[in-house]
């Protein structure tokens, strides 16, 4: 219990001491030069909505940022597009908007009859008209920034789909604690998780509603259905994601000692994520296999060793005018250890405490966070907690996360099984 208190205190500290002024997702330094007088003016501006930021490149938007701007002035902006450096510019006396992203060799001109029309063409490029060039930009964002909702960081859909397979395969022990397996019949799992994460000046709050169901079959196997829903808020820009996974927990009997139990859990999963504010949308499918080995070292003490390998691949998705392909294929390897100790009773309820550590690593396409670690603890309050006459184990947990490029965060969890 003391260890869990330390995790909670650390999480509160992270929540209260996050960046006072988090970075804007889209920001730039704007400069204009009058073609007649030669006078130059500069200003900075940022937005957390891709369309609002794009509006800064209309005549009205540039005028609001640079009072000396005219429709024939030269205008240049060194910008950060979700962390990817780029340059957008108008030459003097020209309506053509030029986009340059040196890191991936993109140099694209949008030639409208007016600057406002050129800006419209640039927006269409971002909505999916960019084709292969847009895919290169998205892959660069995943590889070099911590805020893409599809992939590249521990809170992206790709990472969360793999983590969900791993967590349900171990009975939720690495998130909210406690194995919900029973000999037969059906059990529902309901939980809530809040997390706060920071990297490279960006802050992200994560709200997750894990939903699950499992059913014990007569042959000792157990059918698993898992459907978590997640809301991410990064610098005020919101992303919504969800996935559905189906798996089978298969007990393995190979003349193991009575103190050992082993199961293999294959799972298939599909999910999607979208954010109008970020201009991002994507879908993924995955297939995973998890091994879970329990060792009852002594009465009241159990160690669980879990190992997972998963293949995750993006799918093209078109939603609300955004047609986007990330073209990513990655392999996720997740390995963890739980130590669980029965602590006794509290108000007539059986209580156990656990500590865990998990290491996650990716291969395949380049990601901003290729490896991260999670350390946590949880308490399980078991029977005889009852709700509406049903026995309902309750789980409280906390997790600290650290990863590549200074990625760090904290989450707190609450879970029920009934």
Regions found by a protein language model. Give the residues of each.
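Sec/Tat signal peptide C-region and signal peptidase I cleavage site
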Residues: 16-22
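Transmembrane beta-barrel domains of bacterial outer-membrane proteins
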Residues: 23-383, 387-417
């Amino acid at each position: 219990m003391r260890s869990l208190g330390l995790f909670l205190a650390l999480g509160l500290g992270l929540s209260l001491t996050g960046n006072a002024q988090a970075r804007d997702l889209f920001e730039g330094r704007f400069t204009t030069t009058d073609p007649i007088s030669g006078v130059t003016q500069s200003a900075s501006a940022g937005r957390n909505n891709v369309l609002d930021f794009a509006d800064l490149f209309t005549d009205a938007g540039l005028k609001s940022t640079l009072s000396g701007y005219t429709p024939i002035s030269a205008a240049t902006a060194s910008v950060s597009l979700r962390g990817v450096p780029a340059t957008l510019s108008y030459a003097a006396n020209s309506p053509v908007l030029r986009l340059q992203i040196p890191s991936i060799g993109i140099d694209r001109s949008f030639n409208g009859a007016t600057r406002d029309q050129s800006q419209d063409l640039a927006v269409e490029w971002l909505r999916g008209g960019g084709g292969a060039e847009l895919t290169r930009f998205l892959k660069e964002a995943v590889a070099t920034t911590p805020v893409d909702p599809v992939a590249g960081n521990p809170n992206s859909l790709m990472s969360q789909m793999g983590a969900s397979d791993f967590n349900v395969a171990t009975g939720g022990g690495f998130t909210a604690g406690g194995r919900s397996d029973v000999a037969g019949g059906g059990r529902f799992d309901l939980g809530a998780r809040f997390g706060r994460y920071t990297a490279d000046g960006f802050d992200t709050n994560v709200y997750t509603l894990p939903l699950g169901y499992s059913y014990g079959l007569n042959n000792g196997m157990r059918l698993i259905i898992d459907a978590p829903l997640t809301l991410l808020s990064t610098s005020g820009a919101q992303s919504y994601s969800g996935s559905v996974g189906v798996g089978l927990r298969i007990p393995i009997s190979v003349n193991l000692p009575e103190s050992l139990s082993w199961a293999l859990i294959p799972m298939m999963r599909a999910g999607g994520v979208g954010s109008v504010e970020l201009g991002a949308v994507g879908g993924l499918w995955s297939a995973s296999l998890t091994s879970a080995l329990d060792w009852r070292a002594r009465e009241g003490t159990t160690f669980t060793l879990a190992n997972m390998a998963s293949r995750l691949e993006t799918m093209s998705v078109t939603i609300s005018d955004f047609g986007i392909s990330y073209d990513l294929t990655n392999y996720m390897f997740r390995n963890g250890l739980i130590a669980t100790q029965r602590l006794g009773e509290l108000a007539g309820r059986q209580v156990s405490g656990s500590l865990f550590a998990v290491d996650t690593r990716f291969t395949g396409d380049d990601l901003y966070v290729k490896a991260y670690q999670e350390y946590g603890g949880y308490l399980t309050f078991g029977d005889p907690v009852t709700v509406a006459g049903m026995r309902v184990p309750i789980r409280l947990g906390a997790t600290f996360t650290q990863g590549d490029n200074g990625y760090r965060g904290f989450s707190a969890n609450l879970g029920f099984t009934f």
